[in-house]
Amino acid sequence: MKITALEGQKISELSMIEVAHALLEQNGKEMQFSEIIRAIQDYLEKSDDEIKASISRFYTEINTDGSFIPLGNNIWALRSWYAIDEIDEEVIALDEIEDEEEEKPAKKRKKVNAFGIEDEIDPEDEEGTKETTEEDMSYDTQAEDEDKDDVAAYDAELAEVELDNVDEEVDIDVEDDEDDSDDTDED
């Protein structure tokens, strides 16, 4: 293979990027990445092992070099072949496609109860389903029952007490403390 743009230069001093640029310029059309690699290997007379060792560095360089443009499906061309407006439109078109994909409504996810299944039976909620024993009662329930028992016992004791010398009609006069103090001062 002969590349006219590189005539007169030492092949051993040429980089793969320089050869790829001259190759695309001479062909005047887009090329597959694999075709570019084969043509570079033939022109630089490199072995398969040498190409395999340098292919990742070359791919990085072709991506970062501003003179190449990827057209998709691993097809490459020279950026100078395309007007700036065309390149911007292609980029905008890709952005619009990405935006349309993002606008698709996402599937609604089912809400998950982080604390377990809602239908799970809680034994504390089933107080009325079995007879409660003293062991099952809480402290508050026991104290309330004991208070009722104490009041009933006190009332029973009061009923049994006989009051001696109690008149049926008892008048209770409520006097002010001030009146009492006045009465005592006068005496």
Curated annotation (Swiss-Prot):
Domain of life: Bacteria
GO molecular function: DNA-directed RNA polymerase activity
Cellular component annotations (GO), alphabetically ordered: DNA-directed RNA polymerase complex
HTH HARE-type domain: residues covered: 14-81
PROSITE patterns from the UniProt entry: HTH_HARE
Comp. bias (Acidic residues): 117-149, 157-187
Gene3D superfamilies: RNA polymerase, subunit delta, N-terminal domain
Keywords attached to this entry: DNA-directed RNA polymerase, Nucleotidyltransferase, Transcription, Transferase
Region feature (Disordered): 97-187
UniProt record, GO biological process: DNA-templated transcription; regulation of DNA-templated transcription
Family indicated by similarity: Belongs to the RpoE family.
Subunit structure and binding partners: RNAP is composed of a core of 2 alpha, a beta and a beta' subunits. The core is associated with a delta subunit and one of several sigma factors.
Protein purpose: Participates in both the initiation and recycling phases of transcription. In the presence of the delta subunit, RNAP displays an increased specificity of transcription, a decreased affinity for nucleic acids, and an increased efficiency of RNA synthesis because of enhanced recycling.
Name recorded for this polypeptide: Probable DNA-directed RNA polymerase subunit delta
Annotated gene: rpoE
